[in-house]
């Protein structure tokens, strides 16, 4: 249990998260503008996004499907009736003066996320669909603010947890698992580095053992799990200091400064009344058919926990290897691609998690960007399986292929790396090594068995690493016994 030790008591932290995940869609929620905030300023904007008079919203049903997939993946209830409402507030990058969202009737209610360490279930209150705002840019010119509406109207789903989270570590575990599920069900790429997932943390504290909830403050727009953990920890400690000094916590909205590691109040938190919610008159209620939801359910993929259990139970992977693979959706897909090509699960897992991951980490890139595709890894592993190259050589071939020096087959052919499997050729290497090392040979005959490993190494070295270790061992032992018998 996570506590903050104050001067007068031990304090518990109570956390609820609102996660804003960008829905995986080519187009915006209510217009056909592309979802691309990397384009030049205000170039991915339609008349509706810019709030020109008389232009009406048209719902992108692909976004509805993705939200349903998220809801199913999280075990929520899909509501066949939901309503889009206008949430009114003023901000320069919100051209309509309101955000189209869902409040009273969200598309998903309920659900949960199971985390580990500790093993715990975090309940989800609701998931609703809404549009993103634009972007205010303050650092282009002194005293001026510029508005880029490329992001305005990008589809989001807001996933609201219950206040079941009790520590910064649990908050990070929840977000990581939530991201993974969204990626598996193809509802969102959920890449925090690209701004595709942001968190608002509602934080309060209470004395250990109490059951009521304290006054909460909301920390907005946390764009990494590191800043999420730091912001929660700082805000919780701040609240403890205020309460222990006799003060009271004011309900307010805050931002987290990553440079000073402190939270900064921006405004008192608005109530639902101040937002003046009402049903958007330009959008009909969203009414879904049961068959539509059932068809989506039938197309749902295997979820992370199910896949991890299958890897352990059916493929006999270690729990560690299964977890490493499943914790990265693209690594899991890479692994499954190798299985479909006929490779043994444990071998495929080792080459991905040890050899390929080592190269990826060294270069600082993700597996989806790997120069060595599953097809190239298949080519490499077939060379190993057929004993055309040794595992030792294969590791070097993998490195060279990763660096763009060709396919595994091309590298093996170009550099004459095929393993020597001819007994007569290996016997020639063995005789040369034994003739060059009479002292070591004598020590072996006198009972020093460890000399065998030395002699095997010398034979492989003489073959430039191309001799099969298994055959070297076999031929060497036969020649040693022949010489022992010859010497009487």
From Swiss-Prot:
GO cellular component terms given for this protein: glutamyl-tRNA(Gln) amidotransferase complex
Reactions this protein catalyses: L-glutamyl-tRNA(Gln) + L-glutamine + ATP + H2O = L-glutaminyl-tRNA(Gln) + L-glutamate + ADP + phosphate + H(+); L-aspartyl-tRNA(Asn) + L-glutamine + ATP + H2O = L-asparaginyl-tRNA(Asn) + L-glutamate + ADP + phosphate + 2 H(+)
GO molecular function: asparaginyl-tRNA synthase (glutamine-hydrolyzing) activity; ATP binding; glutaminyl-tRNA synthase (glutamine-hydrolyzing) activity
A biological-process GO annotation: glutaminyl-tRNAGln biosynthesis via transamidation
PROSITE patterns, A to Z: GATB
Keywords of the record: ATP-binding, Ligase, Nucleotide-binding, Protein biosynthesis
Function comment: Allows the formation of correctly charged Asn-tRNA(Asn) or Gln-tRNA(Gln) through the transamidation of misacylated Asp-tRNA(Asn) or Glu-tRNA(Gln) in organisms which lack either or both of asparaginyl-tRNA or glutaminyl-tRNA synthetases. The reaction takes place in the presence of glutamine and ATP through an activated phospho-Asp-tRNA(Asn) or phospho-Glu-tRNA(Gln).
Subunit structure: Heterotrimer of A, B and C subunits.
Name of the protein in question: Aspartyl/glutamyl-tRNA(Asn/Gln) amidotransferase subunit B
Lineage, top ranks: Bacteria, Pseudomonadati, Pseudomonadota, Alphaproteobacteria, Rickettsiales
Gene name as annotated: gatB
């Amino acid at each position: 249990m996570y506590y903050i030790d104050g001067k007068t008591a031990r304090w518990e932290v109570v956390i609820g998260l609102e996660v804003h995940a960008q829905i995986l869609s080519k187009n915006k929620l209510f217009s056909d503008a592309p979802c691309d905030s990397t384009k030049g300023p205000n170039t991915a904007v339609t008349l509706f996004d810019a709030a020109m008079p008389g232009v009406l919203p048209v719902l992108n049903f692909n976004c509805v499907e993705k939200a349903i997939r998220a809801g199913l993946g999280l075990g929520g209830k899909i509501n066949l009736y939901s309503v889009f409402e206008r949430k009114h507030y003023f901000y320069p990058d919100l051209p309509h003066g309101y955000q189209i969202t869902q409040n009273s009737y969200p598309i998903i209610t309920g659900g949960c996320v199971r985390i580990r360490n500790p093993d715990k279930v975090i309940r989800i209150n609701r998931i609703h669909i809404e549009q993103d705002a634009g972007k205010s840019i303050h650092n282009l010119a002194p005293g001026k603010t510029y508005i880029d509406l490329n992001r305005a109207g990008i589809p989001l789903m807001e996933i609201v947890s219950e206040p079941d989270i009790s520590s910064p570590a649990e908050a990070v575990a929840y977000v990581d698992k939530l991201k993974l599920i969204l990626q598996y069900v193809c509802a969102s790429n959920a890449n925090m580095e690209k701004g595709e997932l942001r968190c608002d943390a509602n934080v309060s504290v209470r004395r250990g053992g109490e059951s009521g909830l304290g006054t909460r403050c909301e920390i907005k727009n946390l764009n990494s799990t590191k800043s999420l953990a730091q912001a929660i920890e700082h805000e919780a400690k701040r609240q403890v200091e205020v309460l222990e000094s006799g003060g009271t916590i004011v309900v307010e909205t805050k931002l987290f400064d990553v440079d000073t590691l402190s939270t900064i109040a921006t405004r008192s938190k608005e109530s639902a009344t101040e937002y003046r919610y009402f049903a958007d008159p330009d959008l009909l209620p969203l009414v879904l058919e049961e068959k539509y939801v059932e068809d989506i359910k039938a197309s749902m993929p295997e979820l992370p926990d199910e896949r991890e259990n299958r890897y352990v139970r059916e493929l006999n992977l270690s729990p560690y290897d299964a977890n490493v693979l499943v914790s990265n959706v693209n690594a899991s897909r890479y692994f499954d691609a190798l299985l479909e090509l006929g490779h043994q699960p444990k071998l495929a897992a080792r080459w991905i998690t040890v050899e390929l991951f080592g190269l990826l980490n060294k270069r600082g890139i993700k597996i989806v960007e790997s120069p060595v595709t599953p097809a190239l890894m298949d080519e490499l592993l077939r060379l190993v399986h057929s004993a055309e190259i040794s595992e030792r050589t294969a590791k070097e071939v993998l490195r060279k292929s990763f660096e763009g020096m060709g396919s595994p087959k091309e590298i093996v052919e170009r550099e004459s790396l095929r393993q020597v499997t001819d007994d007569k050729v290996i016997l020639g290497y063995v005789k040369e090594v034994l003739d060059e090392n009479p002292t070591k040979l004598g020590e072996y005959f006198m009972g020093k068995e460890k000399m065998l490993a030395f002699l095997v190494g010398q034979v492989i070295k003489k073959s430039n690493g191309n001799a099969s270790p298994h055959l070297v061992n076999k031929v060497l032992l036969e020649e040693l016994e022949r010489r022992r018998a010859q010497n009487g």
